[in-house]
Amino acid sequence: MSNLENFRAQVSEWLEENCPPSMRTPMVEDEVVWGGRNAVYKNPESKIWLDKMGEKGWTAPALPKEYGGGGLNSDEIKILNSELFKIGARPALNSFGIWMLAPVIIEYGNEAQKMEHIPKILKGEIRWCQGYSEPGSGSDLASLSTKAEDMGCLLYTSDAADE
């Protein structure tokens, strides 16, 4: 048995033992787990599933183990996703922190920032969001506008020279 076949067998066995039955059903809108300090779990098995996946590092399988991720390579992640799909498992955590913030902290944060924030994000203990605010538009990104002025071989967009 190859390493990947062995990994698939281990994942399948772990999921069979640890994924609660109600987490193998289609997602119910009010049961989506966003995490955070004041998270409410309408389905108690959602919290169990989050805790188990968080302990395993599989809420963010590609992130390094030392920060609470799974430390998996791309082939292992494909297998994990395939096995999750096979049993119809719901995502344990929907988190902008995982998708948007954790990769930035991994890339640009210092060690203290990584250790402080990433494990809490991956376990759903804290919740992050991203806000946009633009002059004349506020947070309505659909109303953004810009203009450009042809300067010969250069093209300047509005406010670009001020940066």
What do the PLM-derived regions correspond to, one by one?
Residues 146-149:
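A structural signal for short hydrophobic beta-strand segments in well-ordered beta-sheet cores
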Residues 136-144:
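Active-site-adjacent elements of ketosynthase-type condensing enzymes
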